[in-house]
């Protein structure tokens, strides 16, 4: 049974659609097939889980959009949230 979802093939995180405990199997659909991985940490409902390793400095992609930059290496199955993602909005003052 699927307990997470991705929207776009570019996504490197899935969204938990129910609470997921450390060690649980996380299953989501990608390209018409179910994909599974093991949760490395507890994931709160509607929070993100890495579906592949995300090196420090790489964009975090959800729903096909960059939502931040990994502030540390994030391993497959880990919780992805403010503790390991930083914003990447442009600083408009620097451009003026």
Residue spans for each PLM region:
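Hydrophobic aliphatic residue packing
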Residues: 13-15, 26, 60, 74, ...
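A short, sequence-level motif marking secondary-structure junctions
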Residues: 21, 40-44, 72-76
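C-terminal structural segments of small proteins and small subunits
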Residues: 63, 67-94
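Loop/turn positions that initiate beta-strands
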Residues: 23, 46, 57, 77-80
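Compact, glycine-rich, soluble single-domain proteins
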Residues: 27-63, 69
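Charge-rich, low-complexity amphipathic helices
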Residues: 35-38, 42, 48, 82, ...
């Amino acid at each position: 049974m699927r307990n997470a979802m991705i929207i776009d093939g570019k996504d490197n995180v899935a969204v938990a659609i129910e609470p997921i405990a450390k060690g649980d199997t996380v299953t989501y659909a990608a390209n018409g097939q179910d994909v599974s991985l093991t949760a490395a940490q507890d994931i709160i409902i509607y929070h993100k889980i890495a579906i592949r390793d995300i090196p420090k400095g790489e964009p975090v992609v959800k729903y096909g959009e960059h939502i931040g930059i990994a502030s540390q290496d994030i391993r497959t199955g880990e919780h992805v949230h403010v503790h390991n993602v930083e914003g990447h909005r442009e600083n408009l003052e620097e451009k003026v």
